[in-house]
Amino acid sequence: MAKTYDYLFKLLLIGDSGVGKTCALFRFSEDAFNATFISTIGIDFKIRTIELDGKRIKLQIWDTAGQERFRTITTAYYRGAMGIMLVYDITNEKSFENIRNWVRNIEEHASPDVEKMILGNKCDANDKRQVSREQGEKLAASFGIKFMETSAKANINIENAFFTLARDIKAKMDKKLEGNSPQGSNQGVKITPDQQKKSSFFRCVLL
């Protein structure tokens, strides 16, 4: 049977329990929101095929449990990931502070050239905000990665986040396939204008 896609990208969602990783994944894969999800046990995944630059890209997106007791299970999935989204809840300062710990987990267990992005989720709950957008931007900039505020509930920036991460992975793959750039070099070449800076920031806007 012929393949129905040109690329297969494995993505990973990590972050503390309750930050909305499952809701973000469900919004992207099913375009739906369910406020009654229970905490993920171990690991689960969804698949969605998208089109970028005329290529069909199959996204296999793994949703990991945030609890410490599942850490051994979930870190085993880091190595094969091509892109990782680190998610915190803007209404939970502790989940934001723990992003640094999640970054350390990536450095220990994931591929050195994995694409990363930080998501400040639940930005629709602005009245309960504990983490400012500027704090999120500053943290992402300190790691040299992209940042977006998102809301699975209000469907803000979810699509944009996954497409941006997939586009960055594809740009990196295309460069490697060309064979004219050493690994680890600047990834800015051939990236479209809306991706030129790895520390780009995206605002949460409620319409």
UniProtKB/Swiss-Prot annotation:
Binding residue positions for Mg(2+): T22, T40, D63
Residues reported in the UniProt entry to bind GTP: 17-23, 39-40, 66, 121-122, 124, 152-153
GO molecular function (one): GDP binding
GO biological processes: axonogenesis; cilium assembly; endocytic recycling; exocytosis; Golgi organization; neurotransmitter receptor transport to postsynaptic membrane
Record keyword Transport present: yes
Record's keyword terms, sorted: Cell membrane, Cell projection, Cytoplasm, Cytoplasmic vesicle, Cytoskeleton, Endosome, Golgi apparatus, GTP-binding, Hydrolase, Lipoprotein, Magnesium, Membrane, Metal-binding, Methylation, Nucleotide-binding, Prenylation, Protein transport, Proto-oncogene, Transport
Motif Switch 2 per record, residues: 63-80
Record localization: Cell membrane; Golgi apparatus; Endosome membrane; Recycling endosome membrane
Reaction(s) the record says it catalyses: GTP + H2O = GDP + phosphate + H(+)
Motif Switch 1 per UniProt: ranges: 31-45
Matches recorded under Gene3D superfamilies: P-loop containing nucleotide triphosphate hydrolases
Residue ranges crossing the lipid bilayer per the database entry: none
EC code: 3.6.5.2
Positions of S-geranylgeranyl cysteine lipidation: C204
Stated regulation of activity: Regulated by guanine nucleotide exchange factors (GEFs) which promote the exchange of bound GDP for free GTP, GTPase activating proteins (GAPs) which increase the GTP hydrolysis activity, and GDP dissociation inhibitors (GDIs) which inhibit the dissociation of the nucleotide from the GTPase. Activated in response to insulin.
Record's comment describing the protein's domains: Switch 1, switch 2 and the interswitch regions are characteristic of Rab GTPases and mediate the interactions with Rab downstream effectors. The switch regions undergo conformational changes upon nucleotide binding which drives interaction with specific sets of effector proteins, with most effectors only binding to GTP-bound Rab.
Function according to Swiss-Prot or TrEMBL: The small GTPases Rab are key regulators of intracellular membrane trafficking, from the formation of transport vesicles to their fusion with membranes. Rabs cycle between an inactive GDP-bound form and an active GTP-bound form that is able to recruit to membranes different sets of downstream effectors directly responsible for vesicle formation, movement, tethering and fusion. RAB8A is involved in polarized vesicular trafficking and neurotransmitter release.
Family classification: Belongs to the small GTPase superfamily. Rab family.
Name of this protein: Ras-related protein Rab-8A
Origin species: Gallus gallus (Chicken)
